[in-house]
Amino acid sequence: MQVDLLSSAQSAHTLHLFHQHSPLVHCMTNDVVQTFTANTLLALGASPAMVIETEEASQFAAIASALLINVDTLTQPRAQAMRAAVEQAKSSQTPWTLDPVAVGALDYRRHFCHELLSFKPAAIRGNASEIMALAGIANGGRGVDTTDAAANAIPAAQTLARETGAIVVVTGVMDYVTDGRRTVGIHGGDPLMAKVVGTGCALSAVVAACCALPGDMLENVASACHWMKQAGERAVARSEGPGSFVPHFLDALWQLTQEVQA
């Protein structure tokens, strides 16, 4: 199984495109991470919007550059709004990304996520346990936490990508991004990133934004992983723990965008 590495030049090129296009991202995400997700997108130059009312969610999905569906704090009313948004996104050809949080541990969200797959997401982002569960290979994970190594989920990710047509992202110590044929690996980051709520959810929002960019979607999505890992490394070098990590992380994302414009 061949895994290619993303080049720094491609990552920088995609970040330049990101800043040029400033995608409007409709984030239907969980209650815990909304502020951090919005700030992450803003730091990179995107425009976030959190619209959750069913009628408005459908309407906004038609005008957004991209849509994110994150099922962490899923409720029946929220599922109804998400379903309406995804239906409209498909009709409007708005690329949408699925973050199937804890899909291997809980039945309701597993059934809901499988239902949404019929609406053809542009991308799916999860940890190893989530991707394996969504692919039907295993039911696992400890809530939102993975119990599997990212590399172990590559075959499941490739299968899921081929079956759905989505770019599939498996995050971990090393991230893997695949379209079912090509697989790209992204190294970097720091274990401290896992001690801050929302880094994975925010990545899903950046992945969604990258699906709206022109060019090679696989490389664009892989670039999103690279930026987050780069910013994480820089933030850890400047912080003393999780509390001071977040502002340094947002600053690091901003600095990355300034560097590609210099």
From Swiss-Prot:
It is an enzyme of class 2 (transferase). Pathway: Cofactor biosynthesis; thiamine diphosphate biosynthesis; 4-methyl-5-(2-phosphoethyl)-thiazole from 5-(2-hydroxyethyl)-4-methylthiazole: step 1/1. Substrate binds at residues 50, 198. The keyword Lyase does not apply. InterPro entries: Hyethyz_kinase, Ribokinase-like. Keywords: ATP-binding, Kinase, Magnesium, Metal-binding, Nucleotide-binding, Thiamine biosynthesis, Transferase. It catalyses: 5-(2-hydroxyethyl)-4-methylthiazole + ATP = 4-methyl-5-(2-phosphooxyethyl)-thiazole + ADP + H(+). Its cofactor is Mg(2+). ATP binds at residues 125, 171. One of its GO terms (biological process) is thiamine biosynthetic process. Catalyzes the phosphorylation of the hydroxyl group of 4-methyl-5-beta-hydroxyethylthiazole (THZ). NCBIfam families: PRK09355.1, thiM. Belongs to the Thz kinase family. This is Hydroxyethylthiazole kinase. It comes from Shigella dysenteriae serotype 1 (strain Sd197). The gene is thiM.
